[in-house]
Amino acid sequence: MKRVLLSVLAAATLCSGPAAAQTQTAPAAGSPTVVNRSGSPTDVEGIIRAFTKKETEFRKALNEYGFRRDAVIQTIAFGGQISGEYHRVSRFVFDDSGNRYEKILKFPVPTMSEITITAEDLEDLGGVQSFALESSKIHEYDFSYVGKEKIDELDTYVFDVTPKVLGDSRRLAALKKSKTPERFFQGRVWVDDQDLQIVKARGKGVPETEKQKFPTFETYREQIDGKYWFPTYTYADDELNFKSGQTVHLRMRIKFTDFERLRGRATVIEQGDESKDKDDEPAKPAPTPTPPAPRPKP
């Protein structure tokens, strides 16, 4: 039976359409109500091993799927008006050689003036990839069991996640100086107590630098083909504060739909906007799915 977070459907409905884009608010904002904070399952480490193993499986499985991505990133002016927008709609499919590529369906000229966003930024979900907590990386994190929470029809275990690098000043400084720094997830995850897999995450990418900031995002997942919990909706509404004194109010909404198992390799190339008749011309290489690491414009 297909299992789905009702919150995903509600949020997507509320945020569809141009008018709604001006009035939408973050779903489930603030601190959630968590029960059984003092108690804990008998095998917390076993639960962590189980859901991080599932993360590894999901990452590999997603490499065999095509899907549609609709990304809207907006800057918000004082008073709540939209001051700029980046809107990119794409379909990720496979060519005859098994390479997945991004076919741009809609990409009007961005109107942002405060920050710049590249195609590569769009692949970086708030600074981290969708499956940041896979088995090979759990040694990089500390997990703290918080309690149990019911989300719609699902009972979940709740964990706070902290990258160990934040406590290592020398390594942290080196990462910030790197031209291609590794990103980590810091935040909270909700794990389905039946399937032991992440169904929701809230957090951000770290470390940040003086010129590169990440919004706090919330990601919901949906069960695809009866077994894979893939991200289907990501939302952020946050202020990015740069050392220069500039503050940017950023709103982001990304939807993943129309998953179809096609098989292939996860080497992704990019194709042009259909509206510009460039469908048959592969462009520069690009990473796999997922949103932004905004940088202030000079």
What are these regions (language model features)?
Residues 22-185, 193-200, 204-215, 223-233, ...:
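Structured extracytoplasmic
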Residues 17-21:
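Sec/Tat signal peptide C-region and signal peptidase I cleavage site
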Residues 1-4:
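Positively charged n-region of N-terminal signal peptides that target proteins for export
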